[in-house]
Regions:
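Tandem CBS (Cystathionine beta-synthase) repeat/Bateman regulatory domains
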Residues: 1-147
Length: 147
């Protein structure tokens, strides 16, 4: 495929979700408290955490937005469990999925973090809009230096 970029044409290979995702994923049990989930997110410098059931199956995701929503509605408490706050209707990506397709999902569903899962639905990593933006900045920087 040839893509016009700044009056030039550049050939590229599609970038896959697995190329840019953060891994291993940061996870928490659905029985953990939201306080524990938030601390784990902070300690790992991530904006989301995947929620697993006792069998290690991905059952949800908690994002910074979820925690801010809960805090602003005075829902946070020492006993609030991850399962009570997590988003359950997950939008996921496969490791071989083109990043452009993942970006479309992010736009369509108004989300910033997508779990990347294998064929059995086990989490492999997380692809965030920040991961994609960082890649875009590096790519643009390379392009500018080459001109």
């Amino acid at each position: 495929m040839v893509v016009p970029v700044f009056k030039r044409s550049v050939r590229y290979s599609p970038v896959k979700a697995s190329d840019l995702m953060s891994y291993p994923p940061v996870v928490v049990s659905e029985d953990a408290t939201v306080e524990e989930a938030a601390k784990t997110m902070w300690d790992n410098g991530v904006g989301s955490i995947l929620v697993l059931d006792k069998d290690g199956t991905l059952v949800g995701i908690i994002t910074e937005r979820d925690i801010l929503y809960a805090a602003s509605h005075l829902l946070l408490g020492k006993d609030l469990k991850a399962r009570s706050l997590m988003s359950k209707n997950l939008v996921t990506a496969s490791p071989d999925e083109d990043v452009a397709s993942v970006l479309e999902k992010m736009k369509d569903f108004n989300i910033r973090h997508i779990p990347v899962v294998d064929q059995e639905g086990k989490p492999l990593g997380v692809l965030s809009s920040r991961d994609i933006l960082d890649f875009g900045v590096k790519l643009l920087s390379l392009f500018i230096r080459s001109t």
